[in-house]
Amino acid sequence: MVARTLGVALSAEFRHNAHWIELMKKIIRILGWSAVALVGAGAVSTIALRRGEPINALWLVVAATCCYALGYRFYSKFIATKILVLDGLRATPAERLENGRDFLVTNKWVVFGHHFAAIAGPGPLVGPVLAAQFGYLPGTMWVLAGAVFAGCVQDFVILLFSVRRDGKSLTEMAKDEIGRIGGFVAYAAVISILIILLAVAALIVVNALKASSWGLFTIAMTIPIALLMGVYLRRIRPGKVLEVSALGFVMVLAAIWGGQYVSQNAGLASVFTLSAPALAILITVYGFAASALPVWLLLAPRDYLSTFVKLGTIGLLGIGIVVLHPTLQMPALTRFVDGTGPVFAGKIFPFAFITIACGAISGFHSLISSGTTPKLIARETETRMVGYGAMMAESAVAIMAIVAACVMQPGIYFAINSPAGIVGQAPAAAAATISGWGFPVTAGEMQALAHAVGEQTLFNRTGGAPAFAVGMAHIFSHSLGGETLMALWYHFAIMFEALFILTILDAGTRVARFMVQDALGHLYEPLGRTSWYPSILGTSALMVGAWGYFLWQGVKDPLGGINSLWPLFGISNQLLATVALCVATTIIIKTHRAKYAAVTLAPLAWLLAVTFTASWHKMFDPNPRVGFLAQAQALAAAPVTGATSRLIFNNRLDAAVTGVLLIMVTLVLVESVRQWIGILRGAREARVKESPFVRTRFAEERG
């Protein structure tokens, strides 16, 4: 009896202690997250309110870290539990439809790496660098807020909705959930937008590599390296992933190191020093080869190689920023907030938002979130980490790009990014113009910097990529090796950027080719077969020719091409995000969770305001530096030459493309709103086309 009484007492005491332990853990969690919130609020306040004196880049790092941590812990969890209702017991298409080729149950960290490598393109590197002409403040605030409340949300919900529909694409989901008309228009819009995105990605690579023998040699060598890796893994040593990884890594380092000797040899340097038009031709040939060749031969090994380079370099850059903790030289806001900026014309609203694009929200991501990634997810609960988390990682890259651009002296930043048509062709004239804006720089300073990084000149290197490379080389050389290695770090950065972007170029061309083949297959069945080479070659040529035309337009533009094509890129990208959010909102309303629809409706409303305003300005603004039609009219009033007549046609074409995209997205929006109103009024049946529930065989692993 005594023993029983003692046991009951001990049991009660144990429960009492366990209760207090849990309570203490809860209090510690609350205090910990409160501290994160307070530190984050302090960092954001410092960034937003500090005026008249430079701030340390660590404030941006701290603000970003806190915002991402809070967003992932609380906002993504709210979405996962209240809106999407993630179910760890539900089998994913990777499990149900596993075929070892397209559908394959894959480790969540491998899926995360694949997804990040696939979505991380030119946007987070280039957009924030270009937008830095407004100062560091606008870009930083939009990257943080846009990623947490818009970009990560879009990627997460589209990924989960695709997983629940057997990995269907965005356009297929649009057809199923919005209707046939909305689906058809969405398909046409996606193809059109993809062409613009690929053209601009190619233009950035061209601008980064033109007149750079070191950079071009390094990138050119990655093609035979990728081919060798593909053959080695497929034919020579099948399955030896670690061997081929080590081999590829060593060869890439050798290519970077060897590039400096190529640049110092007059004969070899002349071979690898090419003009922008020549590079444009070569990159279109590469795009065709990457789309038409077997995926194991070039695309897969290059993507595999670039994934290691991307993740490793981003990690090193983050460490470099923390170690160096540089001061931002760019002011919070510059004089160019009035829309007269030399990098691109236009006021902060809406142009800062469409310029930053992918660093905050990217429509292109919705194609990946409804493409290969949902076919690899092992469990629904992993979509939160992959969808929301990978976009946070890309947003962190955008913050690093802002730091890289803003640690330079503003005069150097504008000398690199301003086109010759704005500041002048001669170095002395360009330096005088930029100094006249209040950002001192001399031709001698620029020549010394060019010599330090192993380039002939850094004036008028538009496109954002060269400026990012200079900033990145500055951070690395001052924190990881000394200034004597600045040239090596600069060309490593160029190689990193080109690999970063070429991954999007070759994968995007292949995705577009698949979409075109799928459409043509309805007209003639063999054209839809992805294994039939006449169809492969024909559709690859069609897609490469389409984006190659816009690339050619950009390289022949006397204002650097980026002035006209990057706004078109930003508008197209954000319009694609608008389509994705229309689909997401429709599904949320159909699943009887309309009270939570603001999670996607709020970013949708913001994107509509931004993209429609930007589109209107790009078409009809009377300022020739802003409006396509105004520039065409101004050129037509001057003496017409072959070059000006081509520019007139291109500007009118850009205006027409913008208008057509706007109309198509408007139609998708109208069809979506009709669905929403009908469902909320009870006039339409709220039926979603999800795959039936099947219990996963991994149920015992639920946690």
List each model region and its residues.
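Membrane-interface helix-loop-helix modules in multi-pass membrane proteins
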Residues: 45-50, 56, 102-165, 176-180, ...
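Transmembrane helix-loop junctions in multi-pass membrane proteins
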Residues: 41-54, 125, 137, 195-211, ...
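Membrane-interface "cap" regions at the ends of multi-pass membrane proteins
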Residues: 16-37, 70-124, 307, 346-347, ...
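Membrane-interface loop-to-helix entry segments
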Residues: 58-65, 70, 76-79, 83, ...
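Extracellular loop-to-transmembrane helix junctions
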Residues: 54-73, 131-161, 171, 214-226, ...
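Loop-to-transmembrane helix boundary motifs in multi-pass membrane proteins
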Residues: 177-195, 387-396, 462-464, 483-493, ...
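Flexible loop linkers connecting adjacent transmembrane helices
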Residues: 76-104, 130, 144, 153-182, ...
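Extracellular/periplasmic helix-exit of transmembrane alpha-helices
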Residues: 321-337, 392-470, 507, 552-557
